[in-house]
Amino acid sequence: MDRVRGSAFLLGVLLAGSLFAFSVAKEETKKLGTVIGIDLGTTYSCVGVYKNGHVEIIANDQGNRITPSWVAFTDSERLIGEAAKNQAAVNPERTIFDVKRLIGRKFQDKEVQRDMKLVPYKIINKDGKPYIQVKIKDGENKVFSPEEISAMILGKMKDTAEAYLGKKINDAVVTVPAYFNDAQRQATKDAGVIAGLNVARIINEPTAAAIAYGLDKKGGEKNILVFDLGGGTFDVSILTIDNGVFEVLATNGDTHLGGEDFDQRIMEYFIKLIKKKYSKDISKDNRALGKLRREAERAKRALSNQHQVRVEIESLFDGTDFSEPLTRARFEELNNDLFRKTMGPVKKAMEDAGLEKSQIHEIVLVGGSTRIPKVQQLLKDYFNGKEPNKGVNPDEAVAFGAAVQGSILSGEGGDETKDILLLDVAPLTLGIETVGGVMTKLIPRNTVIPTKKSQVFTTYQDQQTTVSIQVFEGERSMTKDCRLLGKFDLNGIPSAPRGTPQIEVTFEVDANGILNVKAEDKGTGKSEKITITNEKGRLSQEEIDRMVREAEEFAEEDKKVKERIDARNQLETYVYNMKNTVGDKDKLADKLEAEEKEKVEEALKEALEWLDDNQSAEKEDYEEKLKEVEAVCNPIVSAVYQRSGGAPGGDADGGVDDDHDEL
């Protein structure tokens, strides 16, 4: 606040602000349809829905229950998921991944600066935010915000759910790391809007995983520690579970630590090895790095079950095949400091929760990186030999919990979920700047949300008519060491001696962990309020609207590509079926007159040549060509069937079955 003396609080005590818990079973029931649960991960995403009394984790169009969080652009189309990841080595600069590490961040953040050097695609500075520049079709350069790329992945999860459920889905619960700050949460919500989703609730990943663990657990109170180490982020949450009540006691973490960092260490090891052994530096060769990244991830996964793997890559550089062993011991040595780094947040969370190690009843492992034996061992050692619980699927637990929360919000959960109550917490302390740059805390970290707290401040100077409210998050005592979330002015305060006006500042954190701040002059009733988000990083409503339009255009473009491929397949199928029909003695070969056969074969030959010459024709061209071929072939086939007294179920179209997509 503009020159407000920290000690000049007129109401020294907070209006203790109702620290209220919330039951979400009845909330928003009327306006929500089926609410899906989406785990939007750094490396993989997953979607679930609560149906027929249990959660279904939904497989994508490739039959996989987790989908790579990858997006790629080629000269003709946009690819999402496996299709994007599988072509990354041949199209590195146009293949985007790890976008969760950029969302809600500033371009100058040290993590962003570090990541820029590690990814093959181009990250640029736009209005202080990291944006991704990529060539889309026809060589056109396009700039995307991290929210837009995340929206493409959310859109893929939405499509996956819609295909399974056979209906349109508008509402979702989306998960975020517990340690995500305000800007990152708001940016994730914006991504949902761009994807055409109403994000009914943002919930923390470890809390969602705790639901997956505790949904069917009855009996007394249990303290559980959720250790969530994923592809790009790390969270620790400590909860008490008691007959359906999930209360978060403390949370901690690192939003930039995960499996991708372990892969990077393997890559750096092999880059050095190649330089030493072959005198070749591949650190700037995006194609080689793409191949190496894929194999590093594969090797890391294999080392969870084996003690040694061989990393083999055909033609890694200059036509040279690469083959080198990697042992589990070497992998652990390369990542030793990162593995040990996970123990810091565990200790802090335990301190904040005020629990002894012996008071933790269960340790729940979430995230693919918890399969690493060394990580499990460190955790086991910290808890004096206690074995972690492996009862939840580490890849699916978060989406599972999100789907349960979705069913509570929609009212579709029924008796199974009606007693569930989530009491989550704000991960970081929230406060304002008072005189001398002091961080005056209004909402301490690990406060149960939603919550509302007010405090009265006054002016620092005589005749002061404006105060500036600067809102920060962080644990340090001075605002210069905390993160500025936003600021706004309250104008029109009547002139008065210093210390006279009473300005009430109210902080309200909603169930999504997003902060609203209001300042009111008690004398005049004049007030200002804002939803605090990373003021420079937040997308404006105009930008969100534009991105929604562009997302719809991309979806339309994707639809056109599919229709074009379907039309081509239809033509090809007809031609090959007809070719088979006129060439098969059991079908029409012996029944056609020479002139008829020649006419049909000529039409089919011409159609196949046309297909070869027109690989990227439009849908209408394929349809027109099909009509041309049918106009020649169908009358001849009909005439033959009539001459032979009709055929059982005689098709006049060469037996084409239009109802099935070809594989």
Swiss-Prot record:
Annotated SUPFAM superfamilies: Actin-like ATPase domain, Heat shock protein 70kD (HSP70), C-terminal subdomain, Heat shock protein 70kD (HSP70), peptide-binding domain
Biased composition range(s): Acidic residues: 654-663
Entry's Gene Ontology cellular component terms: cytoplasm; endoplasmic reticulum chaperone complex; endoplasmic reticulum lumen; membrane; nucleus
Top-rank taxon, per record: Eukaryota
Alphabetical GO biological process terms: chaperone cofactor-dependent protein refolding; endoplasmic reticulum unfolded protein response; ERAD pathway; protein refolding
Signal peptide span: 1-21
Region (Disordered): 641-663
Keyword terms, alphabetized: ATP-binding, Endoplasmic reticulum, Glycoprotein, Nucleotide-binding, Signal
GO molecular function, one term: heat shock protein binding
Residues modified by glycosylation: N614
Motif (Prevents secretion from ER): 660-663
Localization in the cell: Endoplasmic reticulum lumen
Similarity comment text for this entry: Belongs to the heat shock protein 70 family.
Entry function: Probably plays a role in facilitating the assembly of multimeric protein complexes inside the ER.
Record protein name field: Luminal-binding protein 3
Organism whose genome encodes this protein: Zea mays (Maize)
Lineage, uppermost ranks: Eukaryota, Viridiplantae, Streptophyta, Embryophyta, Tracheophyta
Encoding gene (name): BIPE3
